Amino acid sequence: MEAAGELEPEVLILGSAADGKLGQVVVGSTADRLLHSSPVPMAISPRGYRGSKAGGLTRITAAYPGTPDTLYVVERVAALAERLGVPMRVVTFAVRGRTMYPPEVGLSTEDSILEQLATHARETLAQLKVDGVVGKDVDLQVVSGNGWDESLDNADWQEGDLLAIGTSPVGGIARVFLGSRGSKILRHSPVPVLVLPG
């Protein structure tokens, strides 16, 4: 982090740790320390990732949970996509937990609650265009699945995609600090992830 302070990089780029599942981001001890202390964005690729055959970045996806404190992720990704001349999309993940409710409540109740969450997420995403946060051409999607792994797999990735996620500030300091949701997205992402300090 000392070198980052002196060199003032725009982003730190890391590969995944050598152990773990191929095709997913594997956070080793060095990356973990950096993920909890970096004042600059960090990019980390899935284990075994070889890059795009197309020769570069083709689209940036902002993971947006729809909360006001994470709007900065969408704004920063919109600026980055414009600067790099690539399309952007915004995705909200509606994830069915392993067990959302006791069995006596019933699966139809879980389905109903998940659909209500997805409906609210679609309305929140649509508001991004109404408010001018993103352009009319930005793709907005709610992606669901049974667990984080299935949800991330269902996100219709393209070769050359980059996923951007936000973090929470620690004690008012803009540093990378992944919450549980961000950690799960990072761990299950099949594409490189850009982690933006909050």
What are the roles of these predicted feature ranges?
Residues M1-S52, N154-G198:
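Gly/Ser-rich helix-loop-strand patches that form or flank binding pockets
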Residues A4, A81, L125-V133, A155:
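Conserved hydrophobic residues forming the short capping helix/wall of the S-adenosyl-L-methionine
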Residues V25, G55, V73, M100-E104, ...:
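Short, well-ordered secondary-structure micro-motifs
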Residues D32, A78, A126, V130, ...:
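Active-site phosphate/pyrophosphate- and oxyanion-stabilizing loops and adjacent acidic/basic residues
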Residues T58-D111, D131-V133, D137-Q141, G160, ...:
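Small/aliphatic-rich secondary-structure junction motif
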Residues V73, H120-L128:
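Short, well-ordered amphipathic alpha-helical segments that serve as non-catalytic structural scaffolds
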Residues S108-E123:
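A short acidic, glycine-rich active-site loop
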Residues V142-S151:
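Charged docking surfaces used in two-component/phosphorelay signaling
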